[in-house]
Regions:
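Short, low-order "capping/linker" segments at domain edges
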Residues: 287-295
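ATP-dependent adenylation/nucleotidyltransferase module used to activate substrates
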Residues: 24-187, 244, 260, 264-274, ...
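Short, aliphatic-rich beta-strand segments
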Residues: 239-250
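Short, conserved charged micro-motifs
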Residues: 253-261
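Polybasic, lysine-rich low-complexity intrinsically disordered segments
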Residues: 2, 15-22, 26
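A short linear hydrophobic-aromatic micro-motif
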Residues: 232-237, 276-278
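Aromatic (phenylalanine/tyrosine) cluster motif
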Residues: 8-11
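Mid-to-C-terminal catalytic subdomains of enzymes
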Residues: 172-178, 182-227, 233-234
Length: 295
């Protein structure tokens, strides 16, 4: 998919903000950063890679306001939680933007199944191909996705794949943080403003551990059950062979500090096929499976 010279210039302007921190500091307000994105979208037909989370929702909101035309594309796969797919459909209706859903078979990709340290690179590379092909078929000018400046901390091989493919990450390039995105969502009255971040289910497995359909479905069910039974918004079920490690949001840990609730947690994890169940007392933190790399 070819990018016009004018669009490329606009993209470079965004990159300059990222590459020169002193430029970003000179911006008077956060709104000036968002204005850069509005300028990028102006007069263009924009396809938003859409998950229904706060990042892609705010990006879609800006596209609807600023672009000549905007469409949403959700890629559905075994590693996309079932609850997230429905949420994406609901938020698309809230935004009033057309949503395309494309089904892909991630587990047919051996590089993803083997779960190497650079798994996210291979995953994003495949996703980028799907997005760009869809954009061409739909007659859109370019594809954008919601990686933000806060996401760039730590191990992020997926960002490299997106940049190589020519998928734009406007929030990252304008140095817009997660907090700034949430603040925008609140001002805009978007329902997802305080929605916890969600990563694909592949992130629940230690690098080098094979990712299978059965394992993914077990993890997905546990997380769904924990949310429903205990009213927890943020939960991760980390796979460690016969053992599953449960993380919940740090401010939500007390919701499970009860003997009967811990028994319920144990029972539902046993039913999912695990011999051992642990509750991570520190709670959820992003990139937990990358901690092994740091050690």
């Amino acid at each position: 998919m070819k990018v016009s010279s004018a669009l490329f210039v606009a993209f470079l302007m965004l990159k300059k903000v990222r590459e020169k921190p002193n430029v970003a500091k000179k911006m008077n307000t956060t709104d000036a950063k968002f204005d850069k994105i509005r300028s990028l979208f102006s007069g263009k037909r924009v396809l938003v890679a859409f998950s229904g989370g706060v990042d892609s929702t705010v990006l879609a909101h800006i596209a609807k306001q600023s672009a000549a035309e905007s469409k949403l594309l959700t890629v559905d796969s075994i590693t996309f939680p079932r609850t997230e797919l429905q949420a994406a459909k609901d938020v698309a209706k809230e935004l009033g933007i057309g949503l395309e859903v494309i089904q892909v078979d991630e587990l047919s990709n051996k590089e993803l199944v083997s779960n190497p340290v650079d798994r996210c690179y291979h995953c994003k590379k495949e996703l980028a191909s799907v997005w760009l092909n869809a954009a061409e078929e739909l007659g859109m000018d370019f594809v954008v996705e919601g990686t933000n400046a806060s996401d760039m901390e730590g191990h992020r091989p997926g960002a490299k794949a997106l940049e190589e493919a020519g998928v734009f990450s406007p929030f990252r390039d304008a140095e817009i943080t997660k907090d700034e995105i949430r603040a925008y969502a609140r001002r805009a009255g978007l329902s997802v403003a305080d929605r916890p971040s969600m990563a694909c289910l592949s992130s629940r497995f230690p690098y080098g551990t094979e990712i299978t359909e059965d394992r993914v479905r077990r993890i997905d069910k546990i997380e769904k059950d924990v949310r429903e039974l205990f009213g927890v918004k943020c939960v991760r079920a980390r796979f460690h062979g016969d053992l599953v490690r449960i993380e919940v949001g740090r401010e939500e840990r007390s919701k499970l500090f009860d003997e009967s609730k811990l028994d319920e947690l144990y029972d539902l994890c046993k039913k999912a096929g695990f011999k051992y169940v642990t509750f991570d007392i520190f709670g959820y933190r992003t990139g937990a499976m990358n901690e092994a790399l740091e050690s």
